[in-house]
């Protein structure tokens, strides 16, 4: 396979050298907001006569680099913004092809590391202890330690992490014991081992006053004690989802599958850190209705973590396949009509995102070109929903779900422990369906993969569960003022929370509505009393877009009480677009910026055109 350049990394590419293993020893300092320690990288040369190599770093202080007991020369290049600074290391001997060397780098992170959020005790549920969590995807691992920060390189890792003894440390690895810190009796060392090779964006660390509850034979749920019961209840379907996922994807190779419920500022719905999925507390709806996010993160154990996009241009390979598996898991649990309902909801989400970007925007392509583009800035639902739509279309073209799931399982088996591009995927698709090449040649590949805007074909969807949502939304959108008295709470009696959410999504596509309609909607349905985060989010967007001033404090509260970017960014954007709340939105952002996650703060600042 020709080497594909990773334009998001400044490190030596995988064709020059490959990191095979990391041994991390570090100490977590809450007072200084730093990680200090050593990263020992076992690197294998991929070429003859290798005399130097380059690693990614970002805002790191390097104390020294040691190889074979000797300090060696290194240079830290100029900072290149979001990409960080290249670190070139001179090797004491020229390496021959396949020769390995251990490079031990002493480093310290910056308090403003883009990979870490440091929470004060006041920002936690327990209010007693500080909290730290990392988020490395896409290219923030370099802000924790020097590495080849590209998904084209996979490594195993071991770690020893020293933390205050009243706290617990967890990583994206198997827990491997704990002991008092011999250098400081007020501290404890936690040990970890990840034996499956992973891209370094899956390295993860959390430190806090964490407790756990067992919810399955291979699953503990971890959180602060205030959330642990609620979380155990919310995610009780985890083991049944894992079993279905194994049936669809093949054996689960990671051993443990734990869940960590983070503080509200966690910027994503979930992060598929191996052995320890991170999830937002906004999933705690009380009725398990948002558990599709767990199905999604479980599915990444195959698509993403075992078979990985080679560069972030091909991110859709991770996310499209994972959404496809997620919806099959939910289909097995709740029926095929439910799978189609979510698939069609996803198509609506895709339409919304394309409308937001503009239909000729390059970020609406399935395969993107991230040369000089920060992956955090390009991030959207496109790789998820356009990717899913392509796979769903292929499923229907090639003979249905069982046939296409056969392909997916074979794809995972073929490319496990590797990193792949769209061309690798497409070649394998053609070889797997060699008897259906005529059908595959009907696909407008160029438009699907490389053109912006909506896909060339819309798949077929069963609309059984969606029809009620559309019908009710149509009633509201077409209602005249004199029709408003015809609405009542009985309208909702046969709708699930998933359908209620879809109803609001449908109305939101037609927003704004007359203010009288919105007030009547609140009067009969009392949406302000609903705490389900997805429903509340769409309801508050509808209120602000329809210019209901009374909703401003509620929308500001939701935008700041939690920091899941899916909710926080659109709420701030809507508030900024409404003249009555524009200044308040900017002021509230500036007030909260210092306590926000670094990536969230950066992106909301861009959205609001401040900073």
From Swiss-Prot:
Zn(2+) binds at residues 296, 300, 319. Keywords: Acetylation, Cytoplasm, Hydrolase, Leukotriene biosynthesis, Metal-binding, Metalloprotease, Phosphoprotein, Protease, Zinc. Its cofactor is Zn(2+). Changing residue 384 to F/H/Q: Alters leukotriene hydrolase activity, strongly enhancing the formation of a metabolite that is normally produced in trace amounts. Pathway: Lipid metabolism; leukotriene B4 biosynthesis. Inhibited by bestatin. The epoxide hydrolase activity is restrained by suicide inactivation that involves binding of LTA4 to Tyr-379. 4-(4-benzylphenyl)thiazol-2-amine (ARM1) selectively inhibits the epoxide hydrolase activity. PROSITE patterns: ZINC_PROTEASE. Its main location: cytoplasm. The modification N6-acetyllysine is found at residues 73, 337, 414, 573. Its EC number is 3.3.2.6, 3.4.11.4. The record marks 376 as: Essential for epoxide hydrolase activity, but not for aminopeptidase activity. Belongs to the peptidase M1 family. Bifunctional zinc metalloenzyme that comprises both epoxide hydrolase (EH) and aminopeptidase activities. Acts as an epoxide hydrolase to catalyze the conversion of LTA4 to the pro-inflammatory mediator leukotriene B4 (LTB4). Also has aminopeptidase activity, with high affinity for N-terminal arginines of various synthetic tripeptides. This is Leukotriene A-4 hydrolase. It comes from Mus musculus (Mouse).
